[in-house]
From Swiss-Prot:
Induction entry: In PHH4 (a deletion of the p-vac locus) not transcribed in exponential phase, transcribed from stationary to mid-stationary phase. Small amounts of longer transcripts that include gvpC-gvpN-gvpO and further downstream are also seen as well as short transcripts that only hybridize to this gene. Gas vesicles appear earlier when grown in static culture, possibly due to O(2)-limitation.
GO biological process assignments: gas vesicle organization
Family: Belongs to the gas vesicle GvpO family.
Protein name according to UniProt: Gas vesicle protein O2
Compartmental location: Gas vesicle; Cytoplasm
Length: 111
């Protein structure tokens, strides 16, 4: 049986529908969903929102997400953590880092 992804004479690997094998970068909605899943799995804090989502030249993503690290009453005293989550072009998490921690009620400039 022939392999549907075969080396072509021009040196590229193409599937019969013309897609290059292994190149299926994820879109914005998928990147946001995967970052949200990563927050739940890795940080164990309630997800609060996504602040930024930027695609890189390599097809990967940089997502800045907020989580509630400590709930308080009133909620303006909640402690919010901003985490940068990096994804490769396939949507796999390649790293995360705490970028900032603040009280919800503080006025913040966006990063």
């Amino acid at each position: 049986m022939d392999d549907p992804v075969a080396d072509q004479p021009d040196g590229t690997d193409e599937t019969p529908d013309g897609d290059t094998a292994g190149s299926s970068p994820i879109g914005l909605a998928d990147a946001q969903a995967r970052a949200r899943e990563a927050v739940a799995e890795l940080l164990e804090h309630p997800f609060d929102g996504i602040i930024t989502a930027e695609s890189g030249a390599d097809g990967g993503w940089r997502i800045l997400a907020e989580v509630v690290e400590r709930s308080a009453v009133p909620d303006t005293q909640d402690i919010i953590g901003r985490y940068e989550i990096t994804l490769d072009d396939g949507g796999r998490v390649t790293g995360y880092e705490l970028r900032e921690r603040y009280r919800r009620g503080e006025m913040k400039e966006e990063l």
